[in-house]
Amino acid sequence: MDNITNNTETFDCDVLVIGGGTAGPMAALKAKMKNPDATVVVLEKANVKRSGAISMGMDGLNNTVIPGHATAEQYTKEITIANDGICDQKPVYKYAENCFDIIQELDSYGIRFLKDENGDYDVKKVHHIGTYVLPMPNGDTVKKALYRQLRRRRLLITNRYMATRLLTGPDGRIAGAIAVNTRDATFLTIRAKAVILCMGAAGRLGLPASGYLYGTYENAANSGDGYAMAYHAGAQLANLECYQINPLIKDYNGPACAYVAGPFGGY
């Protein structure tokens, strides 16, 4: 069902996933695969069918670690260099280790990645160390494919509800969340045994100097609300001083990151 909140003020579930962009559906699917009998809810402030930073599609993945093209060690080194050494290498390495399995899983969902005449992933060279860029000919179907998987596994979806605070139990453990409807301002309390935050980054925390809302490369929903919720619930936040925002070039549509020029002699 697409909406569990008709005339409902409270709801109980096993796992609450806040955020229905890309990470949220993946987390919800993993939870359901782990325990098919679990009640898993995806809470989204827009609509899961077309929400998140990848809502309108993606022309490629810039950070794929595929055997034969790159190693986890190479990727970790590349990311460390790109960030001037300010990098927590453990999660970066873990991401690199799991990357290929996730790509194959997405491939099985019908998300098509560019392949060569031998049927291998056609990864492109952009970074200094290793080869990581994997084009996606039908990247506009990512959300459709993920939504099909959610429906197939009968996960519960609550659209148009924005989480505002995490709930904690007497022992300090997270016990659910409070959300407000973005259309009629009604409140919903969801009690959960486990809560997973998949709420995107904070690249739209402020406006560009021009004041133009879409003058950056960041999705408008990436407002940092997940960080705020975690902080208010007692979580320790790290690396917020490493703020990244990608300005756009006027009247230009396409990749415009400076590091693209590096392997070709630019600086």
Stretches with model-predicted labels:
Residues M1-K77, K115, P135-Y267:
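Residues forming the flavin
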Residues R50, D84, D88-Y95, T131, ...:
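Short secondary-structure transition/capping motifs
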Residues G57-D59, N83-C87, Y121-G130, R204-S210:
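Gly-rich Lys/Arg/Thr-decorated short loops/hinges at beta-loop-alpha junctions or inter-strand turns
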Residues A82-D122:
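Rossmann-like flavin
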